[in-house]
Amino acid sequence: MKAYNINEKVTEGEHNVRRGRCILCEAHGVTNYLDKGEGYMVWIPSRGKRIVCNEHYINRGSIGYHSNALRGVSKIGTHKTTTLANTPLGIEVETSLYNASDSEYTALRALVESCTFCYMESDCTVSGEMPTQPMEGLNRISKILQSLEMHNQLSILSHNSCGAHVHVECNRVPYVRRYYHSIFLPLNDYIDSLGAERRIEVFGSDFRYYAMKINENSDPQAHSNIFNTQHAHTLEFRLPRVTGYKQYMNVLKFWREVVCYINHYNFKEDADAVTRKATARACGEALVKIAKKYF
């Protein structure tokens, strides 16, 4: 499949995704139909082709949490210079509006309109999904979730069909794929040992078909793994769902610290195979210690 650059114009005969409508205009409640040649085709890795109008193309910049976060990172939130605070993070929050009240729909629309870092797009499994641009810091998303909880409107994000997956930039993805089981099986087993009730309390949901626990035979790049390595520049945690402001913020901080640890871990890549595997296992054990700080 052809990968489009963000500056490539839609040409005559090119297939217009979403019937030629700017997806960012739609996020603000405006249906903006674009004729052939008027919009810009944007390629969002793992999401596919998307069209934006000229105004949003000029003002928007880099779109998508799957892209290399070093390009066009939106420095939202904290001004701290710690490694942890400056680790780019993105989320994709699924929504369920099939039985939503007018106030819930209005709240979601206001949420999207108030954001310069997320937009609404379609998802075949739910009624909508809000991916964010890479963020440094958690203040903005924290305030949004706190506001929704205060007004008893978190139900639009916590339906049992929804997820709230977390992506954190990782500079060791190829290595993580190679030693996936050594790194993540200890953490997987610890989460499994919590029991269903505690998992739902901590993560907002239990294992399910699109967030499955792993075993020694799991494919490291299987999309449904709770720890997903299929993206080139991020590690994704697929288990969470938003059920509360503090609950989800705790999950974000946990996964950010896990990936930050992996990014700066000395995997001894020049050592022999036995040493490399033992080093990867030691990393996996350290991730469990991180998890125990949070839950």
Language model regions located:
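Short recognition patches in nucleic-acid-associated and regulatory proteins
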Residues: 3-46
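Terminal catalytic/cofactor-binding subdomain
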Residues: 24, 43, 49-155, 243
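Aromatic/basic-lined ligand-recognition segments
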Residues: 90, 177-243
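A common structural junction motif
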Residues: 112-119, 149-157, 188-191, 257-266
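Helical (often loop-to-helix) elements that flank the catalytic cores of nucleotide-handling enzymes
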Residues: 138-148, 172-199, 245-259
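Flexible helix-coil linker/hinge segments at domain or subdomain boundaries
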Residues: 157, 192-206, 261-293
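Histidine-centered divalent-metal-coordination microenvironment in nucleic-acid enzymes
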Residues: 157-173, 234-238
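Modules that initiate DNA replication and primer synthesis
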Residues: 231-281, 285
